[in-house]
Curated annotation (Swiss-Prot):
Residues 1-14, 88-227 are mitochondrial intermembrane. GO terms for cellular component: mitochondrial inner membrane; respiratory chain complex IV. This is Cytochrome c oxidase subunit 2. The gene is MT-CO2. Residues 46-59 are mitochondrial matrix. It comes from Speothos venaticus (Bush dog).
Length: 227
């Protein structure tokens, strides 16, 4: 979950987000080592009188600083490509939910059910109950079963939007006339918050997303009540 004044990433709730966190740490360590090396070299050149500051040609050095960055880029690219393919892979989803962005709310349709759809609007600040989050609560949450592969079909009715839930590692553009898809699977129950992540007009900040991940039995009860 997110915390006030949080500096790091949110706790991972899906396998994809776990992979993204590991990749972030992996890449950050490489950047830290490179920055430390560059800082050390600059400090040495400024403090050591024996440094060759007027060298015009050094084939060995040029070879090293060509091969070494190439190796580093490969070490970054390989895990990145692996995660990219994992994010696009959808194997036998148990449930499909169609999401449409509007100015300025979301519509959801459970395509596996005959008539299960609703709109999701932000709850105004003056109507919030004690303990609810400002600018993040909605009148209709998206209830989904946990530990099951779910396919989200995402599009827009008007302008560009972006459907994003950070703790699940999700961010997919909602484009008018185009149907994008992504997959999600939560490893534990709970409420997961997101927001529209593409500037879409004056009320862009008032398009929250709330996913309520529950056990399958609870989801079946909820869907029966909604029909």
């Amino acid at each position: 979950m997110a915390y006030p004044f949080q500096l790091g990433l949110q706790d991972a709730t899906s396998p994809i987000m776990e992979e993204l966190l590991h990749f972030h740490d992996h890449t950050l360590m490489i950047v830290f080592l490179i920055s430390s090396l560059v800082l050390y070299i600059i400090s040495s050149m400024l403090t050591t009188k024996l440094t060759h500051t007027s060298t015009m040609d050094a084939q060995e050095v040029e070879t090293v600083w060509t091969i070494l960055p190439a190796i580093i880029l490969v070490l970054i690219a390989l895990p990145s490509l692996r995660i990219l393919y994992m994010m696009d892979e959808i194997n036998n989803p148990s449930l499909t939910v169609k999401t449409l962005g509007h100015q300025w709310y979301w519509s959801y349709e459970y395509t596996d059910y005959e008539d299960l759809n609703f709109d999701s609007y932000m709850i105004p600040t003056q109507e919030l109950k004690p303990g609810e989050l400002r600018l993040l609560e909605v009148d209709n949450r998206v209830v989904l079963p946990m530990e099951m592969t779910i396919r989200m079909l995402i599009s827009s009715e008007d302008v560009l939007h972006s459907w994003a839930v950070p703790s699940l590692g999700l961010k997919t553009d909602a484009i008018p006339g185009r149907l994008n898809q992504t997959t999600l699977m939560a490893t534990r129950p709970g409420l997961y918050y997101g927001q529209c992540s593409e500037i879409c007009g004056s009320n862009h900040s008032f398009m929250p997303i709330v996913l309520e991940m529950v056990p399958l039995s609870y989801f079946e009860t909820w869907s029966a009540l909604m029909l």
